[in-house]
């Protein structure tokens, strides 16, 4: 069996901003599903941005509820530390900004928006990490606070009717109910924070690849006879954006 001669071909690497062939000379697309894949990717990133905004609004709403609610002195220390850290208000700000930049970048892909979305995603991931640590610590302190609440409720002084009535009014809310409501609120904030951290890291990786890709060009396989057509070889000689790899 004799080997057939293989015609010479040229591999030309072209930047995406200089590919402008005429309609008659343009090669046929080899993978039509790539455009569909890009459209699905853009749609998924928009969905990710929307989820980030919703997470930010959820954490902000729960933070406002915690700030306006009143708890027994045993649980006040748990909520006051969380509110003093300002995470329920600063964290959602970064979440909403990051999600908005992700959506805006997909609508109009520019270098400035890509870098802005990258910075926003990094800040959002860092704030979510800090918030996750704070919420985990505060949720771990709920059990000791609930036990102390039960002890204080059982040790109400009964020296006089006035004193008993005063101390009893402080503990009209059941300790278990207060613990359950706080645990539910902190759990929702923790879930939204963890989800935001994962989405922010994913978005940051995508934006990093977009912003600092080594060669954002296209690879075209053209026959050797195409090089002599329409002065392509002379153009490649003077244009440093082309890289020609000849195979014999």
Curated annotation (Swiss-Prot):
Pfam families: CD20 (PF04103)
TM regions (residue ranges): 47-67, 85-105, 117-137, 186-206
Cell location: Membrane
Residue ranges that the UniProt entry lists as topological domain Extracellular: 68-84, 138-185
GO biological process: cell surface receptor signaling pathway
Keywords for the protein's UniProt record, in alphabetical order: Membrane, Receptor, Transmembrane, Transmembrane helix
Keyword DNA repair: no
Cellular component aspect of the GO annotation: plasma membrane; trans-Golgi network
Topological category with respect to the lipid bilayer: Multi-pass membrane protein
Residues in compartment: Cytoplasmic: 1-46, 106-116, 207-248
Domain of life: Eukaryota
Entry's family note: Belongs to the MS4A family.
General function of this protein: May be involved in signal transduction as a component of a multimeric receptor complex.
UniProt cross-references to PANTHER family, sorted A to Z: MEMBRANE-SPANNING 4-DOMAINS SUBFAMILY A MEMBER 6A (PTHR23320:SF135), MEMBRANE-SPANNING 4-DOMAINS SUBFAMILY A MS4A -RELATED (PTHR23320)
Protein name: Membrane-spanning 4-domains subfamily A member 6A
């Amino acid at each position: 069996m004799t080997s057939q001669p293989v015609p010479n071909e040229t591999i030309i690497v072209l930047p995406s901003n200089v590919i402008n062939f005429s309609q008659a000379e343009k090669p046929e697309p080899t993978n039509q599903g790539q455009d569909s894949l890009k459209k699905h990717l853009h749609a998924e990133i928009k969905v990710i941005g929307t989820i980030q905004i919703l997470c930010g609004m959820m954490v902000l709403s729960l933070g406002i509820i915690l700030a306006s609610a009143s708890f027994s002195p045993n649980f006040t220390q748990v909520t006051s530390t969380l509110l003093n850290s300002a995470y329920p208000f600063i964290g959602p700000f970064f979440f909403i900004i990051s999600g908005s930049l992700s959506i805006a970048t997909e609508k109009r892909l520019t270098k400035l928006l890509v870098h802005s979305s990258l910075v926003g995603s990094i800040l959002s991931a860092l704030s979510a990490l800090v918030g996750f640590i704070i919420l985990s610590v505060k949720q771990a302190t709920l059990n000791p606070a609930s036990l102390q609440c039960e002890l204080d409720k059982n040790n109400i002084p009964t020296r006089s009717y006035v004193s008993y009535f005063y101390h009893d009014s402080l503990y009209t809310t059941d300790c278990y109910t207060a613990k359950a409501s706080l645990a539910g609120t902190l759990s929702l904030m923790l879930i939204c924070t963890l989800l935001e951290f994962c989405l922010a890291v994913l978005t940051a990786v995508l934006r990093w690849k977009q912003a600092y890709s080594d060669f954002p060009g296209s690879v075209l396989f053209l026959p050797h006879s195409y090089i002599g057509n329409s002065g392509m070889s002379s153009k490649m000689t003077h244009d440093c954006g082309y890289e020609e790899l000849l195979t014999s």
